[in-house]
Curated annotation (Swiss-Prot):
Keywords: Ribonucleoprotein, Ribosomal protein, RNA-binding, rRNA-binding
Gene symbol of the encoding locus: rplF
Function: This protein binds to the 23S rRNA, and is important in its secondary structure. It is located near the subunit interface in the base of the L7/L12 stalk, and near the tRNA binding site of the peptidyltransferase center.
GO biological process terms on file: cytoplasmic translation
Quaternary structure annotation from Swiss-Prot or TrEMBL: Part of the 50S ribosomal subunit.
Keyword hit for Cell cycle: no
GO cellular component labels: cytosolic large ribosomal subunit
Protein name: Large ribosomal subunit protein uL6
Record-linked PROSITE patterns: RIBOSOMAL_L6_1 (PS00525)
Species assigned in the record: Staphylococcus epidermidis (strain ATCC 35984 / DSM 28319 / BCRC 17069 / CCUG 31568 / BM 3577 / RP62A)
């Protein structure tokens, strides 16, 4: 039995989960998420819990069981608590600022880099060098944060670049002179 898949998902009182076959809609105080999950899985919904049940013990069903449960749990957590990723800009003159809902990064290029806020994503800039990406979809928040980091990933010699908060950047020693 999948250790992740057999866990029962607790649903907070302010969140509603509705199933239409394999299509799931989760509504909560932070927003609403929809997704089509694996059609082979069945869902047992009771008052405050949902259990994902797999049809057989085949290898494919065992792997999909845990994945389906994790996706559904992430949706429930997203609409109730939300997700947030924090990025730090490290480097002389590196800064971020808001322009409406969009994010503008000055990270050593000849031009500022503009990142559009997708629907359901909000940016917050603190102290010009810290960017917070938040939203209800864990997948979307992670993808946007990764796109921001890829604008100027941290380099190993001086450590300059955009990094996740708490990310360890392995440093290298420079060339030694003759």
């Amino acid at each position: 039995m999948s250790r992740v898949g057999k866990k029962i998902i607790d649903i907070p009182s302010d969140v509603t989960v509705t199933f239409d076959g394999s299509h799931v809609t989760v509504k909560g105080p932070k927003g609403e998420l929809e997704r089509t999950l694996n059609e082979r899985m069945t869902f047992k919904q009771e008052e405050n819990t949902v259990e994902v049940v797999r049809p057989s013990d085949s290898k494919e069903d065992r792997t999909d069981h845990g994945t389906t449960r994790a996706l559904l749990n992430n949706m429930v957590l997203g609409v109730s608590q939300g997700y947030e990723k924090t990025l730090e800009l490290v480097g002389v003159g590196y800064r971020a600022q808001m322009q409406g809902k969009d994010l503008v990064l000055n990270v050593g290029y000849s031009h500022p880099v503009e990142i559009k806020a997708e629907e359901g994503i909000t940016f917050a800039v603190e102290k010009n060098t810290t960017v917070k990406v938040s939203g209800v979809s864990k997948e979307q928040v992670g993808a946007i944060a990764s796109n921001i980091r890829s604008v100027r990933p941290p380099e190993p010699y001086k450590g300059k670049g955009i990094r996740y908060q708490g990310e360890y950047v392995r440093r290298k020693e420079g060339k030694t002179g003759k």
